Amino acid sequence: QVEVQIITQQPKVPLEEIEDVKRRLREYTDRVNKGESFSMLARLYSEDRGSAMRGGEIEFSGRGMLDPAYANVAFNLQDPSKVSKIVESEYGFHIIQLIEKRGDRIKTRHILLKPHIPEEALAAGCARLDSIADDIRNNKFSFEEAASVLSQDKDTRNNHGLLPNPNTNTSRFEMQELPPEIAK
């Protein structure tokens, strides 16, 4: 078994890219309001591959199983024929439609769009991570300190960068359980 610590930096997304995503989501909302099928639009345009092929459907979920921003809007939806306002989550930007509520669980469908990140922003993010790695190697600060102060990953920064194993609710992983991008 292994434990994994990570430091995450998000690349800067140009405002024009965010505005383009929001414009497209407003267009999809207008189309649904004019009678087009939300499910069909999700199949065609959503960038959530897992739910897109199911018409954007996310099975019954409790509030804690969803991104907090998504859950906040989704749990306040009342009318299944209405489309939510645009929601920004850690995954991108969504519009949401309520399918059904059962007690403290909801079933929704959504369309997710992610802003395009230019190559230069990715390169700048990589350079920043390389600089942090050099500072750690040169003992300017420990990995734990860097993760706590510099990481932008909300799930790990308050735990010194320790990656949680969602299968066991611990920080320990079998090698085959590691996400492929980490197991390399």
What function would you assign to each model-found segment?
Residues 74-81:
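Soluble sensory domains of the PAS superfamily and closely related sensory modules
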